[in-house]
Design a protein with these regions (language model features):
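Conserved AMP-binding/adenylate-forming core of the ANL superfamily
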Residues: 3, 12, 20-74, 91-96
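N-terminal amphipathic/basic helix or basic patch
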Residues: 2-13, 108
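Flexible, low-complexity linker/hinge segments
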Residues: 1-5, 135-142
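Structural core segment of the AMP-binding/adenylate-forming
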Residues: 10, 50-51, 78-140
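Hydrophobic/aromatic residues within well-ordered alpha-helical segments
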Residues: 7, 14, 40-41, 121
């Protein structure tokens, strides 16, 4: 438990110390400053809280490496939930199996992957959120 708190404190200190500096950049895409990262983490924390996510619940992330993927990862672990990272190269049936086997409650997903997924194949999933803008995807939270 102490390691977890130390890690979260390190992230918080890094954000506070570097508030106006660039933190994450997508290749030929967006650049987020540390303050942007903090604000997005806070918004995801609110989303997780409103979805009834509790410490230890599993949250799956499937998407290409990006600033938003990283923000989502940081938000989930600092919230106290467990990240289930899924490679974006996996086929839809593999993603379905991992989501189901892990008992993930939510799935953050890149739009390229979402197009190939079948919500009905993940019956226990409570919601799908798009990584590009953190909006509730075509599947809404139950």
């Amino acid at each position: 438990m102490e390691l977890e708190q130390s890690f979260i404190a390190l992230i918080e200190q890094s954000i506070k110390t570097n508030w106006y500096l660039n933190a994450l950049t997508d290749y030929k895409g967006i650049t987020l400053q540390y303050r942007d990262v903090a604000r997005k983490i806070e918004k995801i924390h609110i989303l997780l809280e409103n979805a009834g996510i509790e410490k230890g619940d599993k949250i799956a992330i499937c998407g290409r490496n990006s600033a938003h993927w990283t923000v989502t990862y940081l938000a989930v672990i600092t919230y106290g939930a467990v990240v289930v990272p899924i490679l974006h190269e996996f086929k839809a049936d593999q993603v379905h199996n991992i989501v189901n086997h892990s008992e993930a409650r939510l799935l953050f997903v890149g739009d390229q992957i979402w197009e190939n997924l079948n919500e009905a194949a993940m019956p226990h999933l409570e919601g799908i959120i798009e990584l590009k803008d953190f909006e509730i995807g075509r599947a809404s939270c139950r």
